[in-house]
């Protein structure tokens, strides 16, 4: 009787010891971009779009700013309602201009 009880206790201890707690889930880190860096990115985006669309930078409107895990995107349009997207890397360096 004691042997059955002892064996069942040992099995229970062994099973409890085998269960591992799952590692905590990692959340993506959201780095904040400074306002001055955002303004620099906007000016660079406007300059690139103005050159591409052969117009002045003052006729370019940036309408949206999105942050992704490893990049940034700025959306905008010209006074003729031509849309574009400027892409930047995680450091804020200009990557490319996409016409939409």
UniProtKB/Swiss-Prot annotation:
Disulfide cysteine pairs (residue numbers): none
A GO term from the CC aspect: plasma membrane
Key words, A-Z: Cell membrane, Lipoprotein, Membrane, Palmitate, Signal
Domain of life of the native organism: Bacteria
Signal peptide: 1-17
Location in or out of the cell: Cell membrane
Bilayer topology term: Lipid-anchor
InterPro entries: YsaB-like
Lipid tethering residues (N-palmitoyl cysteine): 18
Main localisation: membrane
Lipid group attachment sites (S-diacylglycerol cysteine): 18
UniProt name for this protein: Uncharacterized lipoprotein YsaB
